[in-house]
């Protein structure tokens, strides 16, 4: 089979930088899927993405679909011919549909008799006839939330399309995609290299684009170049560049031919908290800040230009000029805010609604203050400090700095609290109350901060559920899913002795008569336990393990986690499958019992050796495992219970549970009931698959 390399490039106006990488990888994945669906073999699909183009290059693409043999079965021979041996109308209709006569059909013998059959070989189409459709479909399936039209065209895409290049080897694949006819014209950099040039072979891409058009089409190549040069520039300045992956991807998406440069700002701005300076450098300007070896911000930054003049001084000066007003604003806001104590902002919180039915931010801080104090008492934190941090928790939202630079909430509260002479634990808690801010983020370090973070999250969860506004579908305006998962992470990873039901009930009381949902405790707890499911699935823990623990509805997160870890370990044991099946069998047997099942095992009613053996082991384990259950040592307990496999198997092999004698039957049911209850102290093992 012959193969060729295939190139498809879509030349556009500037694509959304935050979406570029996602669009490019999705384009490649879609092309791969379409090729597979068409039955076209290939070696590899490479993707390229720059601000004004999306491209894929398919290596080793078969130049034609493989031929395939098809078999069309017709009517049974007995129904295909009449008594005189002439073809019936059914046979003739089938044959006509196949493009043959009845006489040309083959016959096959089956266990149900003899049938007419037509076998044919369908030749595969040339690949070049399929490529326009494949690329069109791949583009149509891109994850584009909002499309646009341009000119007088009816076609829609994320941005206007100007060129389409489709080359199978050196052959131009003619066709129209998104209203643009394919050709061999490729556009280069807006300001460097050739604006337009011709490409004659798929193999010339992307090298020719870099050589003639001054465009580095390979996203990962540009990204690596920016990273290396930024680190090199920072090192030369005696520091380390702060290069976050998301910002690096965004900057990579903004330039076609990256030119990495370093610039500076006045040292006086370093008197402003670094977080505010970094916020504007990263968020507004897409710059990379530089820190010294001790983690202190240096008065330098890295930026990436899309042009490469011999003398970059003008570009550097321009960027320094652009960032100066933003830093001046931050300096002004900071100095203005310092004229008031953080506590002086409390009255202003009364002017800002948290939620119409739940009151103002001042109401919320009062609740957080009380709840943080209660939590602090339970986890051994300083109650006074926790309450103080709770009281001040939202004051920085009223400051000029946070109003202008919203992402500095919390961290500016910390800086202002320090300036006011607040206790260090209180100040740090004002920042850490929002942790974890996203999946994988760090947790509050101190117990005081943990108390405030939990109080804030439980206040929001309880309040919003308490007025019947639980998240529906993907809508979650109060970020309740994130709040629930964050609270669970804090409790579990810090092994805090807290109960969800108690926390929600305590929180609910602080709302007075504002809540209208009488089931708020159960609903919030169920919601949070549901977030456990997502958390553990992300960790790769089997769904049946999570279901087994959820069936017991433990409401202490640290305890829930211990059970999940124990059951996950138990599931790997050789005896797990048999004991899970046995528990399922026990559940089915006991479910059919009418009336109450006794929990007392009468030794005088033990007849068979196998039931005696099981009963004795169950009775012994009941005494031995109680201390383990009380201490939450579930894995050790399940390891001990795993040793029951043989006696359980023997019991079911040799003992008739539903004996005719009612006393024997009830006693055997009691044995099984006690056996099941031992496992249920941890989880419902019968749910393991």
UniProtKB/Swiss-Prot annotation:
Its main location: cytoplasm. It catalyses: tRNA(Gly) + glycine + ATP = glycyl-tRNA(Gly) + AMP + diphosphate. InterPro entries: DALR_anticod-bd, Gly-tRNA-synth_bsu, Gly-tRNA-synth_heterodimer. GO terms for cellular component: cytosol. It is an enzyme of class 6 (ligase). Coiled coil: none annotated. Pfam families: DALR_1 (PF05746), tRNA_synt_2f (PF02092). GO terms for molecular function: arginine-tRNA ligase activity; ATP binding; glycine-tRNA ligase activity. Its EC number is 6.1.1.14. It is found in: Cytoplasm. One of its GO terms (biological process) is arginyl-tRNA aminoacylation. Keywords: Aminoacyl-tRNA synthetase, ATP-binding, Cytoplasm, Ligase, Nucleotide-binding, Protein biosynthesis. Belongs to the class-II aminoacyl-tRNA synthetase family. Tetramer of two alpha and two beta subunits. This is Glycine--tRNA ligase beta subunit. It comes from Glaesserella parasuis serovar 5 (strain SH0165) (Haemophilus parasuis). The gene is glyS.
């Amino acid at each position: 089979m012959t193969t060729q390399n295939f190139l498809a490039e879509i030349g556009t106006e500037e694509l959304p930088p935050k979406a570029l990488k996602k669009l490019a990888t999705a384009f490649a994945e879609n092309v791969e899927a379409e090729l597979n669906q068409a039955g076209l073999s290939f070696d590899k699909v490479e993707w390229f993405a720059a601000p004004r183009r999306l491209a894929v290059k398919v290596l080793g693409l078969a130049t034609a679909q493989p031929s395939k043999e098809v078999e069309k079965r017709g009517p049974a021979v007995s129904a295909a011919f009449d008594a005189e041996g002439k073809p019936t109308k059914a046979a003739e209709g089938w044959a006509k549909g196949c493009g043959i006569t009845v006489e040309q059909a083959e016959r096959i013998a089956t266990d149900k008799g003899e049938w007419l059959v037509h076998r044919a070989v369908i030749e595969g189409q040339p690949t070049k006839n399929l490529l326009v459709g494949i690329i069109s479909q791949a583009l149509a399936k891109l994850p584009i939330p909002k499309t646009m039209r341009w000119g007088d065209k009816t076609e829609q895409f994320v941005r206007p399309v100007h060129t389409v290049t489709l080359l199978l080897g050196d052959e131009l694949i003619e066709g129209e995609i998104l209203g643009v006819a394919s050709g061999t014209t490729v556009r280069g950099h807006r300001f460097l290299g050739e604006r337009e040039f011709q490409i004659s072979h798929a193999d010339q891409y992307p090298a020719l684009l870099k050589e003639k058009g001054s465009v580095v089409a390979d996203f990962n190549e540009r990204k690596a170049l920016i990273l290396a040069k930024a680190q090199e520039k920072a090192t030369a300045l005696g520091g380390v560049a702060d290069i976050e992956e998301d910002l690096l991807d965004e900057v990579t998406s903004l330039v076609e031919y990256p030119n990495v440069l370093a610039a500076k700002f006045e040292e006086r701005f370093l008197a402003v908290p670094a977080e505010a300076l970094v916020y504007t450098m990263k968020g507004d300007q897409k710059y990379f800040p530089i820190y010294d070896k001790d983690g202190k911000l240096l008065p330098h930054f890295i930026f990436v230009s899309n042009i490469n003049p011999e003398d970059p001084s003008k570009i550097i000066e321009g960027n320094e000029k652009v960032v100066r007003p933003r830093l001046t604003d931050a300096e002004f806001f900071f100095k203005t805010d310092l004229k008031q104590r953080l506590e002086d902002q409390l009255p202003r919180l009364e002017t800002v609604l948290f939620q119409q039915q739940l009151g103002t931010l001042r109401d919320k801080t009062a609740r957080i203050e009380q709840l943080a104090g209660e939590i602090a008492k339970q986890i051994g934190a300083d109650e006074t400090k926790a309450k103080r941090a709770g009281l001040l928790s939202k004051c920085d939202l009223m400051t000029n700095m946070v109003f202008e630079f919203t992402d500095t909430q919390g961290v500016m509260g910390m800086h202002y609290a320090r300036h006011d002479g607040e206790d260090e634990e209180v100040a740090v808690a004002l920042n850490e109350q929002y942790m974890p801010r996203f999946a994988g983020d760090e947790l509050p370090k101190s117990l005081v901060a943990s108390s405030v973070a939990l109080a804030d999250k439980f206040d929001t969860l309880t309040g919003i559920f308490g007025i019947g506004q639980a998240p529906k579908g993907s809508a979650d305006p109060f970020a309740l899913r994130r709040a629930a998962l964050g609270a669970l992470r804090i409790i579990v990873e810090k092994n805090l002795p807290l109960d969800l039901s108690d926390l929600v009930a305590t929180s609910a009381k602080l709302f007075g008569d504002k809540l209208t949902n009488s089931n708020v405790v159960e609903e919030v707890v169920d919601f949070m336990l549901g977030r456990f499911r997502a958390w553990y699935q992300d960790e790769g823990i089997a769904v049946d393990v999570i279901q087994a623990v959820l069936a017991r509805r433990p409401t202490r997160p640290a305890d829930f986690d211990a059970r999940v870890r124990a059951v996950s370990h138990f599931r790997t044991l050789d005896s797990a499958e048999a004991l899970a099946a046995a528990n399922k069998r026990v559940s089915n047997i006991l479910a059919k019992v009418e009336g109450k099942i006794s929990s007392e095992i009468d030794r005088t009613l033990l007849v068979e050796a196998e039931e005696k053996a099981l009963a004795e082991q169950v009775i012994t384990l009941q005494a031995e495992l109680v201390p383990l259950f009380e201490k939450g040592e579930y894995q050790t307990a399940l390891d001990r219970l795993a040793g029951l496999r043989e006696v359980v198997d023997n019991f079911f092999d040799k003992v008739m549970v539903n004996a005719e004698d009612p006393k024997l039957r009830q006693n055997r049911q009691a044995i099984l009931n006690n056996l099941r209850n031992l496992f249920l102290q941890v989880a419902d093992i019968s749910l393991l698959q």
